[in-house]
Amino acid sequence: MLPIWKLPVNHLLCHSFKSIPRTSAYAVRFAHHTSNNDDLEVKKNTVYERYERKLKSKAEELHMPVTNLLKKGQTKEREHVIPKKSFSAKKSLVGQNAKKSDLSGLNRYIDVEKIKELPTSTIEKLWRARNIGDDILSACIPKEIYEKMLSRARMYPYFVLPLPRGDKGIESHFLQWNFPNKNEAHLLVTSLLEYKLKGSYAAPHTIMLHFADLLNLKGITLMRCQFEPKKLSANDVQLLVLAIQKFYNASENTPLGKERLALLAAFSKGADFDLHKVATHMDMLE
């Protein structure tokens, strides 16, 4: 049976986003301990190790202790490596020349008042047509599925999903839900390695916007998924979207569903979480 979410590949349009909120303490610890790329970690006192002789010479010239000079050098290096503005979601997914708009929510993309009287099938076609392109996925999610997914997202706002990378093993991605208002739910997806290195300055490569303006009237939620093709392929994003459905829309009445919900809970609680089990579920067809 085909998946309920229909996912044509569409076009990336301009949109602004708030900075990523702080995550749970366990999510931060997980990000800092789940990587085999230890050689990428920032080492302390690298300025001193590389430029010791120059530092001593400069310190003598300025009549200043080497430690004081070192602190200044490290501050400048951090400012150069991780400028605050460069890692914001706005810079990564929004064109710098995007025009400002007074429209908000779903009205940024489609006139809600005009489509309210249209049949659901027509709204779905218009939504797809509005989002045609290579760097976006769109979908119309039925009310029952969205409400179940939303309730789980509020219970478990953080999770990790792995993507297969052939002989290199897996590449983990950090999921973070955000709820700016009653009609919107945003899901930000960031490379776990990038989050480990940059923390709150890490920019999401994928942002899923859910608009529930028509939920009660038409029984659907409109989903728009923007992603950066330089960081993730459309196939990878589709795999993530389907995996999100598997876990956040899991049934409470089946063994598979119960195990998936248990994995969501385990990650939130920080106990007995098994990333390899998550990968196994992603390989399953159901």
From Swiss-Prot:
It is found in: Mitochondrion. InterPro entries: ATP11 (IPR010591). The keyword Acyltransferase does not apply. GO terms for cellular component: mitochondrial matrix; mitochondrion. GO terms for molecular function: protein folding chaperone. Keywords: Mitochondrion, Transit peptide. Belongs to the ATP11 family. PANTHER family: ATP SYNTHASE MITOCHONDRIAL F1 COMPLEX ASSEMBLY FACTOR 1, CHAPERONE ATP11. Essential for the assembly of the mitochondrial F1-F0 complex. May interact with the alpha and/or beta subunits of F1-ATPase. This is Protein atp11, mitochondrial. It comes from Schizosaccharomyces pombe (strain 972 / ATCC 24843).
